[in-house]
Amino acid sequence: MDRQIPTPENPWLALRNLTPARIALGRSGISLPTSAQLDFQFAHAQARDAVHLAFDHTALSEQLKERGRDSLVLHSAASDRNQYLQRPDLGRRLNERSVEQLRQHAKTNPGGCDLAIVVADGLSALAVHRHTLPFLARFEEQAAADGWTSAPVVLVEQGRVAVADEVGQLLGARMTVMLIGERPGLSSPDSLGLYFTYAPKVGLTDAYRNCISNVRLEGLSYGMAAHRLLYLMREACRRQLSGVNLKDEAEVHTIDSENTSNQKGNFLLGEG
């Protein structure tokens, strides 16, 4: 006669409310339950789709125009998606036509600008489609109060982070902010990354950039991301640097932070 073997209580179960990570999924014998396996396969498919989704720069350009913002549509040196994925170096530079387009814009608009905002598909065009406009609405509203001048929003197809350095250099921008789709995770196919650089020029390494990651509804809010970015920009202008020598020390007071600031112990274990 078959006897049901009791399953021991999973001590990780209580932590599922604190993270979207795949923990405490349960088991069927030595395998995952069917529901957990199907969820994993669905999330993996979403991540793959996000990587290969085409960047709809035409729609984004029209939406920016409706909000009173001009834009320039450029292309990296990577000719297509396959080359972009196989040759990261080509995604860091503009193609010749785009370089000439920026040079012509700089000639007709001499004097440079304080800020160049660059938007690239990166590894998740889905993130750019979902979060660019809501974030810019929060960010530019606050940035305008500081009196910074901005170039048209630059949309780069098949672009990587460093392509913003070339854009900023050609436009004569004092600062660049890159909005780019981050590498999709199994719980975050639409995560937007922000990369800030002071005095951009071709050849800078990641050490000269500041990153604000996981901007999305389930991650870092648009308002919080804008607050942190503006702090970095103000400090960069004051100290004339960015990257590893510029730390994000922006103070953000929330109800949760005030309630937990005096607590001791490990919150995961229910201490304090």
From Swiss-Prot:
Keyword Iron-sulfur: no
Major enzyme class: lyase
Cofactor: adenosylcob(III)alamin
GO biological process, one term: ethanolamine catabolic process
Cellular component aspect of the GO annotation: ethanolamine ammonia-lyase complex; ethanolamine degradation polyhedral organelle
Listed InterPro entries: EutC, EutC_C, EutC_N
Keyword Lyase tagged: yes
Short name of one Pfam family: EutC
Cofactor binding remark: Binds between the large and small subunits.
Subcellular location: Bacterial microcompartment
Family under the similarity heading: Belongs to the EutC family.
HAMAP family assigned: EutC (MF_00601)
Annotated PANTHER family: ETHANOLAMINE AMMONIA-LYASE LIGHT CHAIN (PTHR39330), ETHANOLAMINE AMMONIA-LYASE SMALL SUBUNIT (PTHR39330:SF1)
The name this protein goes by in its record: Ethanolamine ammonia-lyase small subunit
Species this protein is from: Pseudomonas putida (strain W619)
Lineage of the species this protein comes from: Bacteria, Pseudomonadati, Pseudomonadota, Gammaproteobacteria, Pseudomonadales
Gene: eutC
